[in-house]
Amino acid sequence: MGLELPLILGTSSVFRREQMERLGIAFQAASPDFDETPMLGESAPQTALRLAEGKARSLAGRFPEALIVGADQVAWCDGRQWGKPMNLANAQKMLMHLSGREIEFYSAVVLLNTVTGRMQRHIDKTVVVMRKLDELHILRYLEREPDAVYCSCALKSEALGALLIERIESTDPNALIGLPVFRLVDFLKNEGVDVL
């Protein structure tokens, strides 16, 4: 590869930063300035992809010669989108409602080359079947995993949240954490970045 462009991860998510760090690829994290409000009539995959693209594009002015990763995740259950509870009370209500249900997580990742304008896109669908939960189990989980309030559906699957799950169907287990790593590696290779 000729010119090596810096890799920018457009996120304020500590979980996505941790995923990138585990890959051992040099990158810089930057918080995108982008309105993440869902649009009326938008499907969960459409929302996830629009937000991932918007995050990447919002950083293009700050990083005019870079590869920018944008990612977002939207959960779908019972005919509606679910986000992050952001506090304990919301997390308890959310987990009680989702107990025993099937949730679809749509994790979008994009890679924007700000020099060429090329944007690669992918949406990964992960189906999660939750165990039947009672209030005591939910309280214990949230006491032991306080960061879960910052996860989609309060489900920190890479840690104790795994105990709440009965089954997962996915082509990329990383996607449920928030970043479809398998596809991102392909995107980076397409840009001439050797990840190993």
Swiss-Prot record:
Cofactors, names only: a divalent metal cation
UniProt EC number: 3.6.1.-
A single Gene Ontology CC term: cytoplasm
Keywords per UniProt: Cytoplasm, Hydrolase, Nucleotide metabolism
GO MF term (any one): nucleoside triphosphate diphosphatase activity
Reactions it catalyzes: N(7)-methyl-GTP + H2O = N(7)-methyl-GMP + diphosphate + H(+)
Coiled-coil portions: none
UniProt key word Transcription regulation: no
Keyword Transmembrane helix among UniProt keywords: no
GO annotation (BP), single: nucleotide metabolic process
Catalytic machinery residues: D72 (proton acceptor)
Top-level lineage group: Bacteria
Protein role: Nucleoside triphosphate pyrophosphatase that hydrolyzes 7-methyl-GTP (m(7)GTP). May have a dual role in cell division arrest and in preventing the incorporation of modified nucleotides into cellular nucleic acids.
The protein's name in its UniProt record: 7-methyl-GTP pyrophosphatase
